[in-house]
């Protein structure tokens, strides 16, 4: 692991994964990827982590698939104790590296915090998380404090054209055709 900030610290940081538990005694770690294809996390370099409030560049020496897991070897991390210090560190890259999307495609990070409003004008709340279900993505919407239906959270499918009627990232607003009682 390099302590120098030679690679430029991300201007627009985005978390692409997390370092998991150690694997073996030679400094290998499990990696949990948030990318659609798990191995795609290795396409985005350089990696950074934050420790003690400071950015640190993480240089990969090697990676491989082991059973269902991805495991990595970080340069300069040669034993289990050193690897343990990296457990639970989020893997961060500069979001400028991410590819441009086609129309009606969105990065989840851009949807976070958007206000979700029905076509009738009812404010359902704000997007606090997204989930992948296999068939479609689902917005986790935290309801407003004075929700007329007593909801705390809603799960709203992200189905463009069916449920999603309009997405305005500039205004941080997603319009949906959805019954507020659900």
Swiss-Prot record:
Gene3D superfamilies noted in UniProt: PRC-barrel domain, RimM
Signal sequence interval, chain numbering: none
Pfam families per the UniProt record, alphabetical: PRC_RimM, RimM
Name listed for the protein in its UniProt record: Ribosome maturation factor RimM
Organism from which the protein derives: Yersinia enterocolitica serotype O:8 / biotype 1B (strain NCTC 13174 / 8081)
Purpose of the protein: An accessory protein needed during the final step in the assembly of 30S ribosomal subunit, possibly for assembly of the head region. Essential for efficient processing of 16S rRNA. May be needed both before and after RbfA during the maturation of 16S rRNA. It has affinity for free ribosomal 30S subunits but not for 70S ribosomes.
PRC barrel domain location: 103-182
Entry's Gene Ontology BP terms: ribosomal small subunit biogenesis; rRNA processing
GO molecular function, one term: ribosome binding
